[in-house]
Amino acid sequence: REKNYSKAQEYYEKVLTINPNFVPAANNLAYIYAEHGGNIDVALNLAQKAREKLPEDANIADTLGWIYYRKNVFGTAITYLKEAADKMPEQPVVRYHLGMAYYKNGNRDLARQELSKALAISTEFDGAGEARKALEDL
């Protein structure tokens, strides 16, 4: 099924205009910006605000980690993504995110471990192709 990210982005932006404190919309919009070419600094700001309101939320930790990954701040990315993976060990996208952060940070063994776990959980997730390519390179 095709995902309509521009429609989702528009929806989340409207929701935040009405209720700027609605954390799920802030988190999801931050992720869309990070993943689909939006302003990465705006994404980071949204995710940080979401984190302040729900500091224990694993989805927000994943979003923050992926934004730091996109900003090439791999050490910080790993911290958040490890937290997300510890809280949601069966989420292949989270394992993929953590594996890619390890990969870019030069942690080859941990990258291989996390990317393999992601693909063992599911072979179809956003980033599965990139995970397979990275594993071939390891």
Residue map of PLM features:
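Structural signature of tandem alpha-helical TPR/SEL1-like repeats
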Residues: 1-14, 36-49, 71-83, 106-117
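Structural marker of alpha-solenoid helical repeat scaffolds
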Residues: 18, 52-53, 86-88, 121
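Canonical tetratricopeptide repeat
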Residues: 28, 63, 97, 131-134
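Residue-level recognition of tetratricopeptide repeat
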Residues: 31-32, 66, 100
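Terminal, low-structured helical/coil segments at or just beyond the last alpha-helical repeat
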Residues: 38, 109-138
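Generic long, charged, amphipathic alpha-helical segments
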Residues: 52, 56-80, 84-86
